[in-house]
């Protein structure tokens, strides 16, 4: 048996146990650091040899000791430790040239090592965006069998509808009958009980007189409606595509049964978002700078795990092994998610509030995996900086030539965890997909028709 690095040991069954509790949750201590001095040199009206030097605002940061671990060679992973560096603001160093011309004051000044402090960097969390990817990864089955059964009747009707349309479309193309081809996508809407009976005797997808059926329908019993572009789009998005996905997921479930399980596996998912912060600063009495910075906030969650080959349910970020068939059957069907999925327009609500994601995470059946290590990592990067020069005088020219912008004391947090990201209620009003825009227009068109 190989020798393990300090902090690791073998358990009774030969498994590797991690004794890094002291490094998982180390104490943070506060440090005060200097950002040096800022230097201004150049020309300002009545001050030809202008020069000024002043200290920049210092930074206070909470940090943990920087520790690292030795990789476990025969297992292929490095145990995770907690490392954090959390400054009390967003400190950006600016080097550039300020130029302004006004009625009263003109100036041309070089700015060196001017450190500004914007809003604090921390305070963001994207677990609710990352969580659904974990739910999909560790789900016992790719197919939502409860939803499939709940929508089975409608799915079967739609499948038969597609088959009939394909058959009649083929016949129309072969005969060169464009009118009949157009009527392939027409639907009959009955208004009486007799009309419903008549609809059962012929296809709902094309006109009775064009198919050879002898069933006659009176206008009082119902009417034929031609499908619009919005009808066809919604039918494609929420009828045909889900049907294809269900077929694909059933095939994936079949292939997963024969998939070889590796001893140690990794999985991580992340999300990033751009945030804009701005503020005004006064390096000199003659002018001020309005600085706008675009920061990229990144959040990644990862786990190292072993697949046990059994099933589990989700409880507060952890997977709990299933001990009886009733619990497994309930999680497999997930009645709460089924009830939500069959609710009309529930998919529209999911665009703005993640109800479906929460019900899926809390109620579905999972593969039981033993998480041996993991991390919750957040960091911030500087994407861009823009600077605008402001003066008290009516300036004809006011410009800032940026030579360098650098993020100092950037936020970083990597916390050890063996849990999964927890999905919480989130209101999302951002437009994330062009498809959602088209869906919205199609739905509004449906409402106007009614």
From Swiss-Prot:
GO molecular function, one term: RNA binding
Alphabetical list of InterPro entries matching this protein: A_protein
Record's keyword terms, sorted: Cytolysis, Host cell lysis by virus, Host-virus interaction, RNA-binding, Viral attachment to host adhesion receptor, Viral attachment to host cell, Viral attachment to host cell pilus, Viral release from host cell, Virion, Virus entry into host cell
GO BP term, example: virion attachment to host cell pilus
Classification via Pfam families: Phage_mat-A (PF03863)
Region entry RNA-binding, spans: 156-174, 255-265, 321-325
Main location, first listed in the record: virion
GO cellular component entries: virion component
Superkingdom as given in the UniProt entry: Viruses
Protein's cellular compartments: Virion
Keyword Transport: no
Family (UniProt): Belongs to the Leviviricetes maturation protein family.
Subunit structure: Interacts with host MurA; this interaction inhibits the first step in host cell wall synthesis. Interacts with the capsid protein dimers.
Function: Induces host cell lysis. Inhibits host MurA activity thereby blocking the synthesis of murein precursors necessary for the host cell wall biosynthesis. May be responsible for the attachment to the host pilus.
Protein's UniProt name: Maturation protein A2
